[in-house]
Amino acid sequence: MSADHEPITLETYELALLRRTRRAREFDQETIERIFGEHLAYTTGMVNSGQQLAAGPVRDSPAEEEHICGMGLFQQGSLDKVRELANADPGVRQGLYRVDVMTWQTPAGRITFTNPPPV
């Protein structure tokens, strides 16, 4: 790095990408709607409790099997903890979704939340 530039400080987050499973096609519409409602209640509760920073659907993902259909942003400091939380999601437990968890970094101060999680 040249002396002309300040070093960049990075903030670390965990990103959970939710994928619809191949098994999802085995579920009838009523079951999918029930599981989705349970999933939505679970993720809303995690955001409201501060365990998860944000969650929501992903639009315009390629319409292929196991496409990404949602994402969650965490700042737990542990991929294992995020995997534990994500795998407890009713949609994951019941086989409608699977989740990929990874670390994501961005320059510090770029992301702010209007309702910060409780400390």
Regions found by a protein language model. Give the residues of each.
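Conserved, structured core segments of small domains
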Residues: M1-V119
